[in-house]
């Protein structure tokens, strides 16, 4: 094929692109590779089962639920009373049930559960039942003298699709603010409160699941929010940092508004937010296949003084990943959530919660491993200094850098003492299987002014040959977890001696402790490029220590998973089996791996991720912390796990299967219109255009896809891309250390250069599959049409011979349809619904033209090729518009009679509607001059560029650019 410039005269012969045999072979190879990649990613996503620490281990639950509908919360109190409802959960046999069948008794502290996308109000029952059981049956285990039973209210949103529709999310937030106002007023009428003279509640604890967590944060930004009515928010699998789908512009605008509002409020040191409001985000991690766990990060929105993000694998005595739906009913988690809530309430205060400092300290205790830097401030803070009941003269002194090993009752003396050096280079570490013991940190060597440090110990999984998973020693199991503490020199400043005392009641009990200046963390410089060729190998052995740290500062991408093989001798009579803590410092993700003599462990992390803001000052390392019995030697082999890597690509780049194909279609249309530069030109077919684009420009395309996503990771380029974006919702951070890449694929690591080409090849294969499906349907229609003509002698009139279609812009039937659809969009239905109807019309246009093209190819070839290309673009616009249609139909199904209060812009569908109707008359855009041609090609080029550069995070705007294109094409059909 020879490329030429635009001809000066129409008489110049043009060599149009054709499908040569060589070109077909090349294109077939690309399609086969694309289909193979698609099959590999799909099969790994479906068939690959998680193992080890990623195995789901939630226990089943039971409860005795009942729900009291709050009928008094009607249209007098909220305009949304006919659409939504409010319920009060009551655990049968525990909570006070309504008197006389309808008189609700409130005597506790209010909690409001907010369901997520398509969620049910009944999902509150698991945590509500756990709270009731814990308070009424096990109150002695609650470390809070001001605890009170909880009243769980739950919102019934009729399983609304919150994630798809911004107006729905806004409606829910408005309704819930009205609900909070009504709930607080109910307590003012409560007989129990009147009789006890207790302070009336002035705030409500919010518990949100999935999008319910975003609705909770949105509530505090609205005009109808009651000031200081919310100070505690707990969210489960809620995408705080970025919207999980980008089909609706209202959702993106709400996200931008909410996050900007919260960031500003939290940066104001004197605001109510900064001094009172806490947010804890809990995610299930790798098992969440509904939304990427990366999106739950609060970094940059809420400071660590007010909240944090944690993973269920991090939480002590939970230690299991949880999927998106199970996170509301997982037995271990619901118990910990219920216990946390009961320990942070204060029935004697009007706000009904403890101070922000107490809530955050309790939050770190319950939901972090205790080994994070942020938890250091919570250790050794007991203000009640006292003298321990230990005879210090009878203790055995343990020298510095000496490992204390106790593994039998005969080896225990009265106590063991560690003298503390003034140097901050020393640290103290201790691991034990004992359930109860005393350890005192004293400010003088005589045992006065001491703190009992037992509560500063962290619980870690019990690891012996009998345990296969970390959850084998989680809450509710018969095996108790180990306890571990690590204190650096700065935390020990002010103390002079550590005294340990305990008794071993079991044969397998042990104690390991050491006060030393040994540096137990080694750094491995291996990066992904080296690791892809040569696995990392290392042996760990130290007779004088039991903790070994290994940091990989160059392994930080969440997109790459690893495989760690461990080998050690199982012949040594060890006190415990070696185990490993895998962790990153932000967000707070920890996974525990119990090691076998020869075992393989999958390493997947949520660290630096696409589209998530990055603080370049934080430690990004992948860290491995090994607990090894003294004398044991472990061999390590770390390599890339390609199977798990491919599996995890799908959940992070699902939207790319819409944006990249649209980019390719626009590029092919641009190529087609490049040659269709006059009324006498030939409009080449879609497959011819696509194959020639691949043949002539594949090198340039692959170079752009490989280098582009990585090259833009510079603050100046990101700022430029922001200003080139016509909607510009993702504003560059004012913090010079924050980097937010919302463009292309959001990649940051050069090693993943191949992701762009992979998705491009898959997208090409998808386009050919869809094109062939259209061809098959057309073939069937042609056969049916021929059969009808043969047996009934009914002939279909040739539309190009009917001169009336040249005289009239639209016929009467089309005008009636335009008026009907226009009125419907402006009054009741969203324009997306009209788009689905238009898509069906365009499909019919192509089927009709296939019949006429079969009769007279020369006459109808251009029109048919043009309509098929337009149909391809229309098909990939359907996923962008379908979610809003689903929301609309859901509202219609529940008989919500109020008009759909968004997406009634008739101009958002008019160009596409009018062009489709012109297509049905067998009209094709007429390129009369170079300016017409330049406008069409420029818009198509921009659509292709925008869809790839900005499309994943702004899919809704891709549709609007396409709609503008359709308006231009419609104008060209009437010239």
From Swiss-Prot:
The EC number(s) this enzyme carries: 3.1.-.-
SUPFAM superfamilies given in the database record: alpha/beta-Hydrolases
PROSITE patterns, alphabetized: LIPASE_SER (PS00120)
GO BP annotations, alphabetical order: endoplasmic reticulum to Golgi vesicle-mediated transport; GPI anchor metabolic process; protein transport
Tagged with keyword Kinase: no
Transmembrane spans: 27-47, 655-675, 699-719, 751-771, 818-838, 868-888, 932-952, 955-975
Enzyme class, UniProt record, top EC level: hydrolase
Cell compartment(s), UniProt: Endoplasmic reticulum membrane
Record flagged with keyword Hydrolase: yes
UniProt-recorded Gene Ontology molecular function terms: phosphatidylinositol deacylase activity
Alphabetic keyword roster: Endoplasmic reticulum, Glycoprotein, Hydrolase, Membrane, Protein transport, Transmembrane, Transmembrane helix, Transport
Residue positions the entry lists as glycosylated: 49, 276, 384, 407, 419, 488, 696, 867
Catalytic residue list: 210
Family: Belongs to the GPI inositol-deacylase family.
Functional summary from the UniProt entry: Involved in inositol deacylation of GPI-anchored proteins which plays important roles in the quality control and ER-associated degradation of GPI-anchored proteins.
Name assigned to this protein: GPI inositol-deacylase
Protein's organism: Kluyveromyces lactis (strain ATCC 8585 / CBS 2359 / DSM 70799 / NBRC 1267 / NRRL Y-1140 / WM37)
């Amino acid at each position: 094929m020879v490329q030429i410039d635009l001809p000066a005269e129409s008489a110049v012969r043009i060599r149009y692109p054709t499908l040569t045999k060589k070109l077909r072979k090349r294109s077939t190879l690309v399609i086969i590779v694309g289909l193979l990649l698609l099959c590999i990613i799909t099969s790994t996503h479906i068939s690959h089962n998680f193992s080890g620490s990623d195995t789901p281990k939630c226990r089943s639950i039971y409860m005795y639920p009942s729900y009291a509908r709050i009928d008094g919360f009607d249209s007098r109190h909220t305009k949304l009373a006919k659409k939504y409802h409010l319920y009060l959960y009551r655990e049968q046999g525990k909570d006070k049930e309504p008197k006389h069948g309808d008189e609700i008794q409130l005597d506790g502290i209010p909690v409001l559960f907010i369901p997520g996308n398509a969620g049910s109000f009944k999902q509150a029952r698991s945590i509500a039942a756990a709270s009731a059981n814990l308070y009424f049956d096990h109150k002695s285990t609650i470390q809070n003298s001001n605890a009170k039973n909880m009243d769980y209210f739950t919102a019934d949103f009729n399983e609304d699709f919150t994630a798809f529709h911004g107006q729905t999310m806004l409606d829910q937030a408005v309704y819930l603010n009205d609900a909070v106002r009504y709930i607080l007023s109910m307590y003012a009428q409560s007989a129990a409160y009147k009789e006890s003279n207790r302070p009336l509640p002035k705030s409500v604890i919010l518990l949100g699941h999935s999008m319910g967590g975003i609705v909770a944060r949105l509530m505090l930004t609205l005009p109808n929010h009651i000031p200081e009515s919310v100070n505690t928010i707990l969210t489960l699998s809620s995408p705080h940092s970025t919207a999980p789908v980008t089909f609706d512009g209202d959702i993106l605008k709400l996200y931008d508004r909410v996050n900007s509002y919260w960031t500003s409020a939290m940066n104001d040191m004197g605001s109510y937010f900064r001094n009172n409001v806490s947010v804890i985000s809990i995610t299930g991690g790798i098992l969440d296949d509904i939304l990427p766990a990366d999106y739950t990060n609060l970094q940059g929105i809420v400071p660590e003084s007010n909240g944090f993000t944690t993973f269920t694998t991090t939480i002590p005595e939970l230690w299991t990943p949880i999927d998106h739906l199970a996170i509301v009913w997982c037995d271990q988690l619901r118990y910990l959530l219920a216990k946390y809530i009961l320990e942070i309430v204060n029935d004697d205060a009007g706000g009904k919660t403890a101070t922000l400092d107490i809530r955050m300290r309790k939050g770190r205790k319950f939901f972090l491993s205790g080994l994070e830097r942020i938890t250091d401030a919570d250790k050794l803070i007991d203000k009640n200094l006292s003298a321990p009941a230990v005879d210090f003269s009878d203790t055995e002194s343990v020298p510095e850098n000496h490992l204390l090993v106790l593994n039998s009752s005969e080896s225990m003396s009265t106590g063991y003492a560690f003298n503390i050096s003034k140097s901050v280079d020393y640290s103290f570490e201790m691991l034990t299987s004992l359930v109860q013991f005393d350890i005192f940190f004293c400010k003088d060597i005589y045992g006065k002014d001491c703190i009992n440090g037992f509560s500063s110990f962290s619980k870690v999984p019990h690891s012996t040959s009998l345990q296969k998973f970390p959850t084998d020693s989680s809450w509710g199991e018969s095996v108790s977890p180990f306890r571990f503490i690590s204190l650096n020199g700065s935390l020990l400043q002010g103390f002079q001696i550590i005294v340990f005392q305990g008794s071993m009641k079991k044969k397998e009990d042990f104690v390991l402790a050491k006060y030393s200046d040994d540096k137990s963390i080694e750094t491995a410089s291996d990066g992904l490029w080296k690791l892809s060729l040569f696995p990392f190998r290392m042996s760990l052995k130290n007779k004088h220590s039991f903790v070994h740290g290994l940091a990989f500062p160059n392994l930080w991408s969440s997109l790459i998973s690893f495989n760690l093989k461990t080998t050690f001798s199982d012949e040594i009579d060890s006190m415990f089996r070696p185990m490993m803590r895998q962790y990153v410092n932000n967000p707070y993700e920890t996974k525990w791996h119990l090691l076998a003599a020869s075992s393989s462990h999958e390493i997947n992390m949520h660290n630096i991720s696409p589209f998530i803001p990055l603080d370049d000052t934080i430690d990004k390392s992948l860290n491995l912390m090994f607990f090894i019995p003294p004398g044991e030697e472990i061999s390590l082999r770390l390599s890339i796990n390609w199977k798990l890597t491919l599996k995890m690509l799908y959940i992070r780049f699902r939207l790319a299967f819409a944006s990249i194909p649209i980019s390719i279609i626009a590029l092919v249309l641009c190529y087609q219109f490049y040659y269709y530069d006059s009324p006498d030109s030939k409009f080449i077919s879609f497959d011819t255009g696509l194959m020639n684009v691949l043949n002539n420009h594949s090198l340039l395309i692959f170079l752009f896809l490989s280098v582009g996503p990585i090259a833009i990771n510079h603050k100046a380029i990101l700022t430029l891309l922001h200003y080139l974006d016509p909607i510009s919702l993702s504003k560059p951070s004012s913090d010079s250390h924050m980097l937010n890449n919302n463009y292309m694929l959001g990649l940051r690591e050069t090693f993943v250069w191949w992701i762009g080409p992979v998705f491009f090849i898959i997208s090409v294969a998808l386009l050919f599959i869809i094109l062939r499906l259209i061809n098959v349907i057309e073939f069937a229609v042609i056969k049916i049409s021929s059969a009808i003509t043969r047996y009934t002698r009914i002939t279909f009139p040739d539309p190009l011979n009917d001169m009336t279609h040249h005289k009239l812009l639209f016929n009467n039937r089309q005008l009636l349809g335009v008026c009907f659809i226009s009125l419907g969009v402006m009054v009741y239905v969203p324009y997306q619904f009209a788009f689905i109807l238009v898509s069906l019309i365009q499909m019919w246009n192509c089927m009709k033209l296939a019949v006429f093209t079969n009769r007279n190819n020369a006459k109808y070839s251009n029109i048919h090729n043009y309509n098929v290309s337009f149909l391809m673009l229309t098909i990939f616009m359907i996923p962008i518009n379908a979610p809003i249609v689903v929301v609309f139909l859901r509202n219609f199904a529940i008989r919500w009679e109020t008009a759909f209060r968004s997406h009634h812009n008739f101009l958002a569908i008019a160009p596409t509607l009018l062009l489709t109707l012109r297509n049905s008359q067998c009209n094709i855009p007429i390129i009369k001059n170079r300016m017409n041609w330049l406008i069409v090609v420029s818009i198509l080029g921009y659509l292709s560029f925008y869809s790839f550069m900005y499309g994943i995070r702004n899919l809704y705007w891709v549709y609007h650019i396409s709609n503008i294109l359709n308006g231009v094409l419609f104008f060209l059909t009437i010239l």
